[in-house]
């Protein structure tokens, strides 16, 4: 009995991977075995960095809030503690935006929690 092969599915599978490898440098973009490994590694990096991205943005927001709070002589931890105590339900993203782009509004919040 002859060996059963499914060339249509094989071609589709390879075509999908090669399409994902488009834009890669050197043999990574046009040699099947190299492209397959490159795409697999890229997917691992993409998965990891979707998590890292969230961490980085949170750290950025904290730095911005800290900078805004220190202009008024208060540390980040003191400020956030007082914000929670006064039941101000603004998250770090919004507070960071206020500190950077709307300093008057941020100062109002600071004065409210002092």
From Swiss-Prot:
Q: Which HAMAP family match?
A: Ribosomal_bL20 (MF_00382)
Where does the source fall among the domains of life? Bacteria
Which NCBIfam families has this protein been placed in?
A: rplT_bact
One cellular component GO annotation, for this chain's record? ribosome
- Entry annotated with the keyword Transmembrane: no
Organism of origin is Flavobacterium psychrophilum (strain ATCC 49511 / DSM 21280 / CIP 103535 / JIP02/86)
**Pfam families reported for this sequence:** Ribosomal_L20 (PF00453)
Family per similarity comment? Belongs to the bacterial ribosomal protein bL20 family.
Tell me, what is an example of a GO biological process annotation in this record? translation
Write one Gene Ontology MF term: structural constituent of ribosome
Q: Which UniProt keywords apply?
A: Ribonucleoprotein, Ribosomal protein, RNA-binding, rRNA-binding
Report the protein name in the record: Large ribosomal subunit protein bL20
Q: Which InterPro entries match?
A: Ribosomal_bL20, RIBOSOMAL_L20_CS, Ribosomal_protein_bL20_C
Matching entries from SUPFAM superfamilies are given as: Ribosomal protein L20 (SSF74731)
**Per its database record, what is this protein's job?**
Binds directly to 23S ribosomal RNA and is necessary for the in vitro assembly process of the 50S ribosomal subunit. It is not involved in the protein synthesizing functions of that subunit.
* Taxonomic path: Bacteria, Pseudomonadati, Bacteroidota, Flavobacteriia, Flavobacteriales
